[in-house]
C-alpha cells in the first residue's frame, strides 16, 4: 500500500535559520585550531593525588586548585612550586595575556583615563574604565598561571581598599592597580606604600 504524503516546503524563515546554523557551525569549526593553541589540549586529565597539607597550601596560594596546578605541584613538589610561583615573571602566561589584550584601558595613565572618561560620544563612558579593570581582575584570577602573584595582588588591593565607585577612583584605581599594586605585589611593603 503506497500512501501519498504531501511535500512540505521550507518557509523562507526556516531556510534562513538552517542557513545561519550551517554558517555558524562552519565558523566555529574553523576556530577550533586557534582555541586549541590558546587553551592547549582540551581532553580531560586526571587530578594528581596530593597529600592534605599540599592540597591546603595549593588552595591558599591559588584561586582554586585547578588540574594543571595540582599536576604541577605533584610533579615538582611544594617547595619548588612556591619558588616557581615567586619568580612569576618567568612563567609564560600567553593565553591570559591574550585574553587581556582586548581591554584598551589597562595600560593607560591617569590623564589618558580621565580624558577617555570625560569625552562624550567617543565609544567610552564612565563605566568603561572600572568595568575593564573588574573583568581583567577576574580573568587573571581564573586563567593566569601566575596564581600566587594574583593572590597577592588581590590581598594588597583588599588591604588598601580603594573603592572604585568613589569620586575620581573610577579611573585612578586602574592606575593604582597597574603602577602600584601589580608592580610591587611580591616586593617590599616600603616600595608598595
Model-predicted segments: where are they?
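Short, functional "switch" segments adjacent to catalytic/cofactor/reactive centers
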Residues: 78-159
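Primarily short, surface-exposed interaction patches in extracytoplasmic proteins
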Residues: 68-70, 132-193
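N-terminal secretory signal peptides and thylakoid transit peptides that target proteins
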Residues: 7-23
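Long, amphipathic alpha-helical surface segments
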Residues: 10-14, 32-44, 176-182, 186-193
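Hydrophobic h-region of N-terminal signal peptides that target proteins for export
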Residues: 25-29
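C-terminal segment of N-terminal export signals and the immediately downstream linker at the start
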Residues: 3, 9, 30-60
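Cell-wall polysaccharide-cleaving catalytic domain and substrate-binding groove, primarily
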Residues: 46, 50-93
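Short acidic alpha-helix initiation/capping motifs at coil-to-helix transition points
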Residues: 48-50, 60-64, 129-133, 169-173
Amino acid at each position: 500500500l503506497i500512501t501519498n504524503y504531501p511535500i512540505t516546503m521550507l518557509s523562507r524563515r526556516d531556510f534562513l535559520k538552517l542557513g545561519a546554523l550551517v554558517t555558524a557551525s562552519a565558523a566555529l569549526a574553523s576556530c577550533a585550531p586557534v582555541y586549541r593553541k590558546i587553551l592547549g589540549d582540551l581532553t580531560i586529565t586526571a587530578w594528581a593525588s596530593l597529600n592534605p597539607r599540599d592540597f591546603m597550601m595549593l588552595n591558599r596560594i591559588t584561586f582554586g586548585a585547578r588540574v594543571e596546578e595540582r599536576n604541577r605541584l605533584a610533579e615538582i613538589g611544594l617547595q619548588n612550586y612556591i619558588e616557581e610561583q615567586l619568580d612569576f615573571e618567568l612563567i609564560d602566561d600567553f593565553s591570559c595575556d591574550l585574553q587581556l589584550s582586548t581591554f584598551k584601558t589597562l595600560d593607560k595613565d591617569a590623564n589618558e583615563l580621565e580624558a577617555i572618561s570625560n569625552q562624550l560620544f567617543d565609544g567610552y563612558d564612565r563605566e568603561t574604565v572600572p568595568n575593564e579593570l573588574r573583568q581583567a581582575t577576574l580573568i587573571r584570577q581564573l586563567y593566569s598561571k601566575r596564581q600566587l602573584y594574583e593572590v597577592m595582588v588581590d590581598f594588597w588591593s583588599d588591604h588598601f581598599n580603594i573603592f572604585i565607585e568613589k569620586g575620581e577612583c573610577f579611573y585612578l584605581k586602574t592606575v593604582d592597580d597597574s603602577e602600584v599594586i601589580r608592580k610591587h605585589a611580591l616586593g617590599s611593603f616600603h616600595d608598595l606604600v
